[in-house]
């Protein structure tokens, strides 16, 4: 792989990680702000508490379906915005 492609690839991976981390951090903060436990979310979704624990880890790559389910339990809607980058 050329240096340029490798650099672009690393940048893309970093952006992917940043999006995941930001999304999960926001859901966790909101859950905690409501005083809702991981167990309460797990019970409502019919999954184990460790599943929610994994979901809330920054390196976890959740499905959109799971994000929507967790958000729904917190009384949130999910909206995804695509914003044109300035560094095209």
Across the structure, where does each feature detected by a protein language model lie?
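N-terminal flexible/basic segments that precede or flank functional cores
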Residues: 1-26, 88
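Short amphipathic helical patch at the helix-1/turn junction of helix-turn-helix
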Residues: 20-21, 32-33, 61
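Short basic helix-loop element that most often maps to the first helix and adjoining turn
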Residues: 25-44, 69
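Recognition helix of helix-turn-helix/homeodomain-like DNA-binding domains
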Residues: 45-61
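DNA major-groove recognition helix of helix-turn-helix/homeodomain DNA-binding modules
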Residues: 65-80
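Short, charged recognition helix plus adjacent turn
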Residues: 80-88
